[in-house]
Design a protein with these regions (language model features):
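Proline-aspartate-enriched helix->loop->beta-strand connector
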Residues: 131-137, 141-155, 171, 267-284
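Extracytoplasmic substrate-binding proteins
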Residues: 58-65, 72-74, 161-236, 256-258, ...
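Bacterial N-terminal signal peptides
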Residues: 12-21
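Bacterial N-terminal signal peptides that target proteins for export
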Residues: 2-13
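Bacterial lipoprotein signal-peptidase II cleavage site
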Residues: 21-33, 40
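N-terminal low-complexity, Pro/Thr/Ser-rich intrinsically disordered segments
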Residues: 37-67, 71-76
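Alpha-helical, coiled-coil/dimerization segments enriched in small aliphatic residues
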Residues: 240-263
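A short, structured surface patch at a secondary-structure boundary
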Residues: 86, 90-144, 152-154
Length: 381
């Protein structure tokens, strides 16, 4: 997967530049000499968020999807009523399809995030989606689901019993897998194929990698990796997982990275041993940087940890969705991390402008200053 992520774009994809090259000084000069200034391909306003459509139907109008269980699903045509149990799905669906009223049901946790996110400004139709058919652990109430008259339902690939009971009720189910950029690309391709927008999938995926390549080029000469700790909840940290991807590209080391899991129990003695220089608090928890910086947590003394002493504690942002898991805004997560960890390489990069340009390119949406502050304002220490 690493080779795929680090691939170079052809001159055709680099013919137009939407975002300014990141970096400054010698690092920026080196990046420019390696032609990184042409690394971000443009998605035109006419294309974003809806690109030219491509006919994916057979002669009888059937659309064929192969899901991440290797199962073939045949749809009678572009579905008018789509339902998902998967939390990040709505904003990825929106990035591919644009404004629509096709998504009629989603996970209640998706709506919790939606109400805190920029997606509520871009995709107001989602507010009316039903959440009565599923709980936060992805267990489906088939009777409630049937009331939604879904053409297709998206469910996690490991929820075997849930998939079976829906299929037994005559409901078509597409299974998706979580965890990697390859998986994310497959989601985008499946959604695009299903909705008759295959060209849009390529645009999004190419633009994603162009932004990641931009950071890679700016950090090419940087050998100092930041020592960062990822807090997923009180006295819980993230070990191995998707975070390894964005830490690799932003050049940071997680001292808990050899441990397996995303919610590992720890104690303060372990934190003192690791002594991280930067701490990131996940967006799925209610913890805030002030809880550590002001030593508010009972029985825990964070004041002696380098990250706290130096004020380097940050909250992971929520944009269209939380930036923690794989998503279309993962390149923004990487840029945000890289600027914090290596400020000398990104001295001239304005993160507000990066987010603004990204939203215009991907969603064809103009963020206001107030919206930008909602995305980034509370993430700083």
């Amino acid at each position: 997967m690493k080779n795929k992520v680090l691939k170079k774009f052809t001159a055709l994809l680099c013919s137009a530049v939407l975002l300014t090259a990141v970096g400054c000084g010698n690092v920026q000069q080196n990046a420019e000499e390696s032609q990184s200034e042409a690394s971000v391909s443009e998605i035109s306003e006419e294309q974003a968020p809806l690109s030219a459509e491509k006919d994916n139907k057979s002669e009888d109008g059937t659309i064929t999807i192969v899901d991440q269980l290797g199962k073939t699903i045949e749809l009678d045509g572009v579905p008018e009523r789509v339902v998902t149990t998967i939390m990040p799905f709505p904003y990825i669906f929106y990035a591919v399809v644009g404004n629509n009223d096709n998504l009629v049901g989603c996970n209640p946790s998706s709506i919790v995030a939606y109400n805190d996110s920029a997606l509520k400004y871009m995709y107001p139709e989602l507010a009316s989606a039903s959440t009565d058919f599923v709980d936060t652990s992805f267990v489906v109430n088939v009777e409630e689901l049937i009331k939604l008259k879904p053409d297709v339902v998206f469910q996690w690939n490991y929820m075997d019993d849930e998939i079976k009971k829906m299929e037994d009720a005559g409901i078509k189910v597409i299974a998706l897998q979580y965890g990697s950029i390859d998986d994310l690309e497959t989601w985008i391709q499946i959604i695009a194929t299903m909705m008759g927008k295959e060209d849009r999938a390529k645009e999004l995926i190419d633009y994603f990698h162009a932004n990641v390549d931009e950071v890679d080029a700016a950090l090419a000469g940087v050998e100092d990796y930041s020592n960062v700790l990822l807090i997923s909840d009180d006295m819980k940290v993230t070990g191995t997982g998707f975070s390894s991807y964005w830490l690799e590209h932003s050049k940071a080391i997680n001292p808990a990275g050899d441990l397996s899991g995303e919610a590992l129990n720890i104690n303060m003695e372990q934190v003192y041993e690791w002594n991280p220089s930067i701490i990131y608090i996940g967006n799925f928890t209610q913890l805030q940087p002030s809880d550590l910086l002001e030593n508010k947590l009972e029985g825990e003394d964070w004041s002696v940890v380098d990250a706290v002493k130096n004020g380097e504690v940050y909250k992971i942002p929520i944009g269209g969705y939380r930036w923690d898991p794989p998503g279309v805004e993962t390149p923004l997560m990487i840029k945000w991390l890289a600027k914090i960890q290596h400020p000398e390489a990104f001295e001239n990069m304005d993160m507000n402008e990066e987010v603004r340009k990204f939203y215009k390119a991907v969603y064809n949406f103009e963020l206001t200053d107030e919206m930008l502050d909602e995305i980034l304002g509370d993430t700083q220490n």
